Amino acid sequence: MTATNLKYIPGMVEIYDSTLRDGAQAEGISFSLEDKILIAQKLDDFGVHYIEGGYPNPTNPKDMEFFEKAASLGLKKAKLAAFGSTCRASLDPAEDRNLRALLDAETEIVTIF
């Protein structure tokens, strides 16, 4: 089986890649928006199942823009995931800007920490 004809097989390992978020936290690493788009396309070409695109929130404009542009990437295999946190105890979830940003990313998958 090659990456170009990957199909779901029960018991098969699925890959969830967090390079665009967690990898960007390494010392000396700062992905540009163009870097993030190219990496996402290459991960899709490799057959990665899930790509964590980043942490869209009002204080992170690069990741917000990535998710805006990601909708038009035309990924063939991979599904994008947005990463974020639950609502803070002191806020009404309907008023939480970070939760709203996760929804605005319009991904099928959201990873919550």
What residues fall within each predicted segment?
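Short amphipathic alpha-helices and their capping/turn segments at secondary-structure boundaries
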Residues: M1-K7, A94-A105
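N-terminal small/glycine-rich loop or linker at the start of catalytic domains
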Residues: N5-G28, I109-F113
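Short, well-ordered coil/turn segments that N-cap beta-strands
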Residues: I9-V13, G47-H49, L75-L80, E106-E108
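Active-site mouth loops of central-metabolism enzymes
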Residues: Y16-D35, A82-P93
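Catalytic domains of carbohydrate-active enzymes, especially glycoside hydrolases
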Residues: D35-N57, A101-I109
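Glycine-rich, proline-tolerant flexible connector loops at the mouths of alpha/beta enzymes
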Residues: V48-G74, A82-L91, I112
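Acidic (Asp/Glu)-rich catalytic clusters
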Residues: F67-L75, R97-E108
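N-terminal catalytic cores of secreted or lumenal carbohydrate-active enzymes
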Residues: A81-A82, L99
